[in-house]
Amino acid sequence: MDQSGMEIPVTLIIKAPNQKYSDQTISCFLNWTVGKLKTHLSNVYPSKPLTKDQRLVYSGRLLPDHLQLKDILRKQDEYHMVHLVCASRSPPSSPKSSTDGESHGALASSTNSNSDHSDSTTPSPSQESLSLVAGSSEGLRHRTLPQAQTDPAQSHQFPYVIQGNVDHQFPGQGVPPGFPMYPAFSPLQMLWWQQMYAQQYYMQYQAAVTAQATSSASSAQHAASSPLNLAHVPGEEPPPAPNLVAQENGPENVQMNAQGGPVLNEEDFNRDWLDWVYTFSRAAVLLSIVYFYSSFSRFIMVMGAMLLVYLHQAGWFPFRQEGGQQQAPNNVDANNEGQNANNLELEEMRLMDDGLEDESGEDAGEDASAAQRPGLMASAWSFITTFFTSLIPEGPPQVAN
């Protein structure tokens, strides 16, 4: 392209990031460099910024001075948006508003009046400085009034928000009065969520403290009641049988689910016909194998054993019921033996304190311990019966009447 073709006019829209000036439309040519554009802006821009203090940004890219506009700007765009950023060494002066002019006029009139009446009244330096500060900050107060204005209903509902943030700027200061601080949530909703969160946290903390205090109190009570049981009178002890009956009649341990409810066992429900067919088919296969590959007597023995196991699981033959019924008397005897042993220990301690202990008590204790030792046959029979009865599966627990 020849030199004459380079003289193509282009329109730039200069935007200031501080929004002190409106968007300025600048006409230039594509063969201009960035440095030449800065020189042109120093002459035509309202703040007259220096060339060395200007920074031009286009499409998020900082433009160096040696590049030409034809290499930077997009050809398909009619208008090109360029951001002008000035360094802090020579910040652009803010435009003078009408309020500033009025304030300066008021200051001039007050100064003239003070000079006219200087012979009668002489104002103090503090009053002059106060008037100057008030006059200079008039425009600033006029500009920042819409930002500091808040909703009167919100300020009435939440006065502590205004009082607690007098010296601190919060995000809602620069928002118009009709626009909420957070568009999606109102302050009342956020305050309610914070209150609910604090309440839930406090409830969990109280539950944890209560559980810890209950466990420590129960352990301390158990430790305090244990020495009292050793020093009680034998005749005043209540019978232990009701305690055992209450434990047997107590609710069973229910297995809980992960979601909080009890675990539902599928075997507790009624079986359908498909389950029964599957069970009978397995039994038929087992019996057919035993019948065809064994003798008739073994087949009868296997059938009888299976029937016995089934009746035991159904609750017809509870093998361990006798032991369960004798458990309470055995516990009573064990408690009585423990009480007798405690009484013997107390008696021995009293005899040792009195100095009346002799060797006859030791011989009698050895004879009693030797008489209580089971024999060899009794131990063997107990081992065999316990081993074979443990092979039989336990039936459902018996319901106490």
UniProtKB/Swiss-Prot annotation:
TM helices/strands, residue ranges: 299-319
* Keyword terms of this UniProt record: Membrane, Transmembrane, Transmembrane helix, Unfolded protein response
Low complexity composition bias: which ranges? 88-98, 109-126
Cellular component GO terms, alphabetically?
Answer: membrane
Annotated coiled-coil positions are none
UniProt membrane topology term: Single-pass membrane protein
**Localization annotation:** Membrane
Q: What residue spans carry the region label Disordered?
A: 87-137
Residues annotated as domain Ubiquitin-like: 10-89
A biological process (GO) of this protein is: endoplasmic reticulum unfolded protein response
Q: Does the keyword Zinc apply?
A: no
Q: Record's PANTHER family?
A: HOMOCYSTEINE-RESPONSIVE ENDOPLASMIC RETICULUM-RESIDENT UBIQUITIN-LIKE DOMAIN MEMBER 2 PROTEIN, HOMOCYSTEINE-RESPONSIVE ENDOPLASMIC RETICULUM-RESIDENT UNIQUITIN-LIKE DOMAIN HERPUD PROTEIN FAMILY MEMBER
* Chain's role: Could be involved in the unfolded protein response (UPR) pathway.
List the protein's name. Answer: Homocysteine-responsive endoplasmic reticulum-resident ubiquitin-like domain member 2 protein
Q: Which organism is it from?
A: Rattus norvegicus
Q: Which gene encodes it?
A: Herpud2
